[in-house]
Amino acid sequence: MRQSVVMYYSGITNSLRLAVFDVIWASPPCETFSTVRRSNIGRNGYTKESIYADMIERGVPILRKTQEIIDYFQPKTWFLENPQTGLMKNYIDPFISFYDVDYCKYTDWGYRKRTRIWYGGVQNENFIPRLCEKDCGFVENNRHVMHVTGTPKGKSSKGQGGGNNRAPRYRIPSVLIQELLSLPYTEDLCLPSDT
């Protein structure tokens, strides 16, 4: 996986050397930084050491390439997002500004998914990050009604990925992006469907 990211990156920089970007949004894979992985210790040969090594050997190099891409293209604005509970924050300069947001405050998907968004460059100074205090309208019995996997809470799902459909886990609310960029609300953002 790491090799393909590096090769793809090399191709981008060779073909877009003169391009000017207003915005770069980067969402590096979160699985190697996930704190949920610790629940696998003792299963299928996973150890604390093997999980840490995977993060250092796969996760951190992808994060560094992501940062290198942002540095190379020097966009007017950039965002780097990952789950707030993950360990990626341990590998990002603590002086880089960030927002913490909850997706349930920006969409009707029914799950919280607290997300950290680091940012740089020109920002919307009117942006106010929204965090859920169980006031989003998607809470029953003091819990959000859906898992990030797209399955109702209390129902069985196969792993964190919800089976073969990982799209719910990786989607980003278009309203959040619109607010971050201070864009008017529109359905035509050229983004993947929110549903």
Predicted segments, located by residue:
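Conserved active-site and SAM-binding loop architecture
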Residues: M1-T195
